[in-house]
Amino acid sequence: MKVEIEDVLFWMDAIRNSEDRYRTLESFWKGQVRSKVWLSDQLNNWYIGLKDIVIFGGWNGVLASILFNVRPDIKSITSVDIDPTCEEIANTVNKRYEMEGKFKAVTADMCNYKYNAHLVINTSCEHITQQQYETWLSNIPEQAMIVLQSNDYFELDEHIRCATDLEDFVEMSKINVTWKAELQTEKYKRFMLIGQKIMD
């Protein structure tokens, strides 16, 4: 994967201007970046026609920037995170696309956020309870494609809903799964599902 040098410079601006540089740098840890590149590669391999994307648990906006580099035909990405410190950082990381009107970072609770999208991504499934997840799932537009990621990294206190393995993640995710896989990183396994809502 190639990243535009202008985007890399904006990444450095985001880190340099951040009040908590170490926390911002966590977005660029090897496991974090590998998981996001893995996701973008899979979408690029088989899902055509990415238009409007909403990323929940968007954190500092690195996934959005990677997706724009892999798929320049993307119309828009909205990155939603409940942490208010993420919004300015994410807008800086994606400054080129923000200036073009293609990117927006939003501070909001994913359980209450209303939207329309062709593709919905949540790479932070381990950070929310099952009840929060199911509330969030119920708000997803019916025809949207869904991409979910979680892991088996139970050691972090903020990881309150990890999966023991890929099948455990499938079971707790409650979607019609069309693709599933796992990625071994240095410290944990990353799980990913692609699918759609189960319709009543």
Report each predicted region and the residues it spans.
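Conserved SAM-binding motif I beta-strand of class I
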Residues: 75-81
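A short SAM/SAH-binding and catalytic strip from SAM-dependent methyltransferases
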Residues: 116-132
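S-adenosyl-L-methionine
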Residues: 1-49, 82-119
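Conserved class I S-adenosyl-L-methionine
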Residues: 48-60
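C-terminal substrate-binding/active-site "lid" region of AdoMet-derived donor-dependent transferases
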Residues: 130-193
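Conserved SAM-binding loop of SAM-dependent methyltransferases across substrates and taxa
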Residues: 60-73
